[in-house]
């Protein structure tokens, strides 16, 4: 993985994803031992779009590994306001750093960045396309809760059209196989056809599209809630009409399995009531921690720094 850019999780083999999960577990239990792993390294966080968790998570990951961070948060703080292209920015920044994390509102921007850069580029979210490191956090949370990421019924609820975390998760779970997806959304926010095609192309996976959450919540092992994203709408009236379509509260949780896990990529608005936070099935703040650990694993891997005392997985590589 040394020197490798990660634009989608298709850039990693199943074996490499499993290795990241294994590394993250090791890091969590060996915080002091890994604290100098990336000494002398510098991460650039180039965020052309607002972010709290993802940017701070990337930065904290490098700092906890002993490295340093430079970057900007908001396109208004970058030379893009002067007309500089992404390619030129990346060619410049590559001279300063060892790895780049980039978020951009345009789909495909991370790929453009990776082709221009001379150091590894990690996609921190490009428009409504992909969000691979959030998916790594999601996988780590499933692994922690269930001991597996397969043989699950996974409900995805809310904005399935623009939700890049949803698209990334579905496509990656299809690679592992044996997942039944329940896609819960209004007609205006249905899952894109290219994502459905990915499910259809996977013999061991299936999907159902429904509009009513309560009618299916009792069948789910995982409920992945998403917010309706105001910034993706051209018409505010459409946003206002759809934003309160799904609100998960204690009443709905009463219909769910006792061991169901509720995930959410955050930030939330009102789609999960605060009263659900104290339910042991709420796993969304656990996802935040797992996101940092997975980014620590990924950053150290792409720059080629070995974790002290870490022993790689011994299993044979799974083709994907």
UniProtKB/Swiss-Prot annotation:
Subunit structure: Heterododecamer (2C3:3R2) of six catalytic PyrB chains organized as two trimers (C3), and six regulatory PyrI chains organized as three dimers (R2).
One Gene Ontology term of the molecular function aspect: aspartate carbamoyltransferase activity
Pathway connected to this protein: Pyrimidine metabolism; UMP biosynthesis via de novo pathway; (S)-dihydroorotate from bicarbonate: step 2/3
Keywords associated with the record: Pyrimidine biosynthesis, Transferase
SUPFAM superfamilies in alphabetical order: Aspartate/ornithine carbamoyltransferase (SSF53671)
Binding site for carbamoyl phosphate: 53-54, 103, 131, 134, 266-267
EC numbers, comma separated: 2.1.3.2
Coiled-coil segments: none
Family from the record: Belongs to the aspartate/ornithine carbamoyltransferase superfamily. ATCase family.
Sites where the protein binds L-aspartate: 82, 164, 227
Job description of the protein: Catalyzes the condensation of carbamoyl phosphate and aspartate to form carbamoyl aspartate and inorganic phosphate, the committed step in the de novo pyrimidine nucleotide biosynthesis pathway.
Protein name as annotated: Aspartate carbamoyltransferase catalytic subunit
